[in-house]
A protein has these predicted regions:
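Glycine-rich, proline-tolerant flexible connector loops at the mouths of alpha/beta enzymes
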Residues: 35-44, 56-87, 143-158
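Distinct, well-ordered alpha-helical segments
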Residues: 118-119, 153-167, 183-194
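Short, acidic/polar
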Residues: 47-54, 122-137, 186-194
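Catalytic beta/alpha-barrel core
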Residues: 127, 144-153, 185, 198
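Alpha-helix-loop-beta-strand connector modules within alpha/beta enzyme cores
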Residues: 77-103, 158-175
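Conserved, mostly hydrophobic/aromatic
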Residues: 20, 55, 95, 138, ...
């Protein structure tokens, strides 16, 4: 799907309805705390199939593939980093099976859980590569678009958007988490976030 096609999709459907609180619903369906969500879903595929079918029945136009923490850094916490391609590919296929042609499937990406230098040890270029690896697999798996969601760090958000744009030209949705003062955890207001995310560039 091109950006122009996505814009047409939005115009055609009016308010576009996304899916629901998948993590919460998975835990209510029996997913234990502390397990790798991506792996658990693949071991219990019917749970996600039923959930996402209910989303579509309720009116969702876009569902998120259950690839939320499917990046190398997060998967490494469970010793699953070498299965990154397999896990992400199968999860996209599972969502596609659930919704058919009744909804779009978004490749879902989020934070790695590590801080960027100088607050942490992870370099910006390394983070772009981490996201680029996942984005490449998701694009190859056939997602219709990407969502970079629940981000608290503008820099990490920029890295994800840069990575996706270097891999493909699919549409990208971005969501950040804001505190009651209207700023992210790192103090960034929405207006500044929009400026930096709209045209992100590598800091050469």
């Amino acid at each position: 799907m091109t950006k122009t096609e996505f814009a047409g999709f939005i115009r055609e459907h009016g308010p576009v309805i996304l899916d629901g609180a998948t993590g919460t619903n998975l835990m209510e369906a029996g997913m234990p705390i502390g397990v790798c969500p991506e792996s658990w879903v693949l071991e219990n595929p019917q749970v996600l199939l039923d959930l996402q079918r209910r989303y579509v029945e309720a009116g969702s136009h876009i569902v998120y593939a259950s690839t939320f923490t499917g990046n190398r850094i997060k998967l490494e916490e469970y010793g699953l980093q070498e299965r990154l391609e397999e896990i992400n590919t199968q999860l996209v296929a599972l969502s596609r099976q659930a919704v058919g042609d009744q909804a779009l499937v978004a490749g879902d990406m989020t934070m790695t859980g590590q801080q960027l230098f100088p607050m942490g040890e992870l370099l910006f270029e390394e983070l772009v590569d981490v996201y680029k690896e996942q984005a490449s697999v998701l694009a190859k798996a056939g997602v219709d678009l990407f969502v970079v969601e629940t981000m608290m760090s503008l820099q990490e958000c920029r890295a994800a958007v840069i990575a996706i744009r270097e891999v493909c030209d699919l549409p990208i949705m971005v969501t950040l988490t804001y505190n009651e003062d209207g700023r992210t955890l790192f103090g960034t207001p929405p207006e500044l976030s929009l400026i930096h995310i709209s045209e992100p560039t590598r800091p050469y």
